[in-house]
């Protein structure tokens, strides 16, 4: 048995992005602002100092 997202030709990451967007779009307006703030991704790059 193959997962539906695999049958559609999607990767799991893309499938989860689509699901998350659908959930955020279905939220009531009072909860939407908080969900939009947390939906972004943060990346921190740290350069290692050579001694």
UniProtKB/Swiss-Prot annotation:
Tissues expressed in: Ubiquitous.
Location in the cell reads: Mitochondrion; Mitochondrion inner membrane
As stated in the Swiss-Prot or TrEMBL entry, residues carrying the post-translational modification N6-acetyllysine are: 21, 32, 37, 44
Q: What is its main location?
A: mitochondrion
What does the entry list under GO cellular component?
Answer: mitochondrial inner membrane; mitochondrial matrix; mitochondrion; proton-transporting ATP synthase complex
One GO BP annotation here?
proton motive force-driven mitochondrial ATP synthesis
The source's domain of life comes to Eukaryota
**Keywords assigned by UniProt?**
Acetylation, ATP synthesis, CF(1), Disease variant, Hydrogen ion transport, Hydrolase, Ion transport, Membrane, Mitochondrion, Mitochondrion inner membrane, Primary mitochondrial disease, Transport
Q: What GO MF annotations does this protein's record show?
A: hydrolase activity; proton-transporting ATP synthase activity, rotational mechanism
Cystine pairs: none
**InterPro entries according to UniProt:** ATP_synth_F1_esu_mt, ATP_synth_F1_esu_sf_mt
Residues found modified as N6-succinyllysine: 21, 32, 37
Role of this protein: Subunit epsilon, of the mitochondrial membrane ATP synthase complex (F(1)F(0) ATP synthase or Complex V) that produces ATP from ADP in the presence of a proton gradient across the membrane which is generated by electron transport complexes of the respiratory chain. ATP synthase complex consist of a soluble F(1) head domain - the catalytic core - and a membrane F(1) domain - the membrane proton channel. These two domains are linked by a central stalk rotating inside the F(1) region and a stationary peripheral stalk.
Disease in which the protein is involved: Mitochondrial complex V deficiency, nuclear type 3: A mitochondrial disorder with heterogeneous clinical manifestations including dysmorphic features, psychomotor retardation, hypotonia, growth retardation, cardiomyopathy, enlarged liver, hypoplastic kidneys and elevated lactate levels in urine, plasma and cerebrospinal fluid.
| Similarity remark | Belongs to the eukaryotic ATPase epsilon family.
The record describes its quaternary structure and partners as: Component of the ATP synthase complex composed at least of ATP5F1A/subunit alpha, ATP5F1B/subunit beta, ATP5MC1/subunit c (homooctomer), MT-ATP6/subunit a, MT-ATP8/subunit 8, ATP5ME/subunit e, ATP5MF/subunit f, ATP5MG/subunit g, ATP5MK/subunit k, ATP5MJ/subunit j, ATP5F1C/subunit gamma, ATP5F1D/subunit delta, ATP5F1E/subunit epsilon, ATP5PF/subunit F6, ATP5PB/subunit b, ATP5PD/subunit d, ATP5PO/subunit OSCP.
Q: What is this protein called?
A: ATP synthase F(1) complex subunit epsilon, mitochondrial
Source organism per entry reads Homo sapiens
Tell me the gene name: ATP5F1E
């Amino acid at each position: 048995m193959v997962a539906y997202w695999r049958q559609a030709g999607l990767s799991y990451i893309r499938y989860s992005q689509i699901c998350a967007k659908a959930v955020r779009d279905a939220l009531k307006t009072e909860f939407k602002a908080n969900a939009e703030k947390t939906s972004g991704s943060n990346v921190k790059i740290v350069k290692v100092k050579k001694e």
